[in-house]
């Protein structure tokens, strides 16, 4: 086939890891992060094209994550996949690894490989990836994420003003401090600093309960909060329904 002639079969996969300590630890409502582990998964086609996917895994279970990537590598190289067969490869591997559970480490490894395959396919065709996705938009909205709970007020405001200066239309701030008054005060400070036109989102990283979530929403809704991300555990469907029911 024409595709076969341009040598798109996956010939090899390589895994690299780097670990770095942060100059200053950061924290959200559920995590304290002092160092990060960073993985690169590289795919090589029979035509010699390289594609890379990146995984930021912070410092969690590096051996398990690397093991999941090595298991996936063995699976892929024992078969003949073209770099554009992203969906088929994912479906095959999910069927293969279903016994151990699809979410979690398996999905992390698959996602990193998926990015590497798209990269290799785009490089094979000599096109940027966004063209392969259809190119239907000239612009997409993006937001600046950060606002870590560990930030001082000065650091928080410096960050959101920098996002505004760079042209971001929205910022996302961490909430879920032990002292809710601090969350409320920080959100007020952000709104004062960036003015009325930028969107503000807040993210508790699943670190709050229903009463504290409802209380926070009521105290800051006049600030025009665009969304509230992960107030409670992502499997607490009843909790989310209650939060929705108790707030406007």
Model-derived features: where do they sit?
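Structured beta-strand/loop patches that form or line metal/cofactor-binding pockets in enzymes
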Residues: 4-58
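Conserved, mostly hydrophobic/aromatic
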Residues: 10, 41, 48, 113, ...
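Metal- or metallocofactor-binding catalytic centers and their adjacent structured scaffolds
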Residues: 12, 44-124
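N-terminal small/glycine-rich loop or linker at the start of catalytic domains
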Residues: 125-150, 186, 193-197
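Active-site mouth loops of central-metabolism enzymes
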Residues: 140-155, 204-210
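Short, acidic/polar
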Residues: 151-163, 211-216
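Catalytic domains of carbohydrate-active enzymes, especially glycoside hydrolases
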Residues: 162-174
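Catalytic core of soluble alpha/beta enzymes
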Residues: 173, 178-248
């Amino acid at each position: 086939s024409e595709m076969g002639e341009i040598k798109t079969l996956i010939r090899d996969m390589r895994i690299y890891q780097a670990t770095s300590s942060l100059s200053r630890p950061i924290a959200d409502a559920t995590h304290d992060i002092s160092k990060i582990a960073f993985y690169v998964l590289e795919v090589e086609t029979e035509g010699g094209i390289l594609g890379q996917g990146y995984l930021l895994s912070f410092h969690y279970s590096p051996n398990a994550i690397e093991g999941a990537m090595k298991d996936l590598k063995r699976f892929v190289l024992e078969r003949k996949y073209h770099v554009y067969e992203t969906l088929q490869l994912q479906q095959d591997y999910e069927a293969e690894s279903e016994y151990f559970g699809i979410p979690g480490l398996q999905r992390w490894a698959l996602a990193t490989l998926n990015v590497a395959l798209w990269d290799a396919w785009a490089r094979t065709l000599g096109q940027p990836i966004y063209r392969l996705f259809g190119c239907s938009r000239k612009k997409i909205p993006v937001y600046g994420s950060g606002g870590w709970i560990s930030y001082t007020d000065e650091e928080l405001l410096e960050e959101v003003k920098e996002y505004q200066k760079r042209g971001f239309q929205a910022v996302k701030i961490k909430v879920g401090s032990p002292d809710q008054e601090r969350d409320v005060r920080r959100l007020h400070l952000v709104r004062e600093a960036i003015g009325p036109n930028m969107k503000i989102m807040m993210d508790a990283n699943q670190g709050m309960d229903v009463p504290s979530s409802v209380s926070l929403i009521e105290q800051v809704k006049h600030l025009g909060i665009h969304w509230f991300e992960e107030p409670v555990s992502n499997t607490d469907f009843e909790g989310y329904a209650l939060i929705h029911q108790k707030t406007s």
